[in-house]
């Protein structure tokens, strides 16, 4: 992921690979207008982004302006033109009811992923990840957890067991290297192919 400024350069460097080109929309607090976010989304796609992270307007959610948020989310999906969409809801600032409402709005708008955090603030609790996973179960919206705090390997694997589909982290080698230990203590199950 990069800021949109770097998207064309990253897209050019990654041309011919299967690595996704990520661009950030509405960072860090999602307080831009819907029109600005839609334009930013269209620009990122035009410049070569293949996956987008958008920040939800937490203030609007806390004000219960659900129709406005849902409309903004739909405009984001439309502006993405089929590119993978994620919505960061920043769970550290939300109540359980607000987390549920945010997930439901993402599902209704057709957003591909609901993401717990930017990773810049407090990460999610286990209970928050379970709540997100329960809300999204049986839908086309998947759960990504970012902002995994220490102990990262244990927390990352527990979040996956709790229903997260993806972990966003800068500590992937540390987490992967701990797989055998996590399996040994029962956090990770042995993988068997279907």
PLM segments and residue spans:
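Glycine-rich phosphate-binding active-site loops on the catalytic face of alpha/beta enzymes
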Residues: 50-60, 113-121, 160-181
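Hydrophobic faces of well-ordered beta-strands that scaffold small-molecule active sites
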Residues: 2, 21-25, 52-54, 85-89, ...
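Active-site mouth loops of central-metabolism enzymes
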Residues: 22-36, 88-98, 146-151
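Catalytic cores of alpha/beta
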Residues: 34-40, 98-103, 150-163
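Active-site-adjacent beta->alpha loops and helix N-cap segments on the catalytic face
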Residues: 4-18, 32-34, 59-76, 94-99, ...
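Glycine/small-residue-rich loop that forms an oxyanion/phosphate-binding "nest" at active or ligand-binding sites
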Residues: 30-42, 50-62
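Conserved, mostly hydrophobic/aromatic
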Residues: 10, 44, 87, 114, ...
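Conserved small/polar residues in nucleotide/adenosyl-binding loops
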Residues: 191-194
């Amino acid at each position: 992921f990069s800021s949109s400024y770097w998207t064309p350069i990253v897209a050019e460097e990654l041309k011919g690979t299967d690595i996704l080109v990520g661009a950030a929309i509405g960072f860090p607090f999602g307080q831009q207008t819907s029109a600005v976010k839609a334009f930013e989304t269209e620009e990122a796609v035009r410049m070569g982004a293949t996956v987008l992270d958008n920040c939800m307007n937490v203030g609007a959610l806390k004000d219960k302006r659900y129709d406005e948020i849902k409309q903004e989310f739909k405009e984001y999906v439309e502006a993405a033109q089929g590119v993978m969409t994620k919505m960061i809801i920043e769970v550290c600032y939300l109540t359980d009811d607000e987390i549920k409402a945010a997930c439901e709005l993402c599902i209704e708008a057709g957003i591909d992923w609901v993401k717990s955090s930017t990773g810049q603030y407090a990460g999610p609790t286990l209970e928050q990840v379970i709540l997100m996973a329960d809300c999204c179960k049986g839908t086309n919206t998947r759960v990504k957890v970012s902002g995994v705090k220490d102990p990262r390997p244990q927390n990352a694997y527990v979040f996956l067991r709790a229903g997260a589909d993806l972990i966003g982290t800068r500590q992937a080698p540390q987490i992967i290297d701990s797989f055998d230990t996590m399996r040994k203590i029962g956090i990770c199950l042995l993988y068997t192919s279907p």
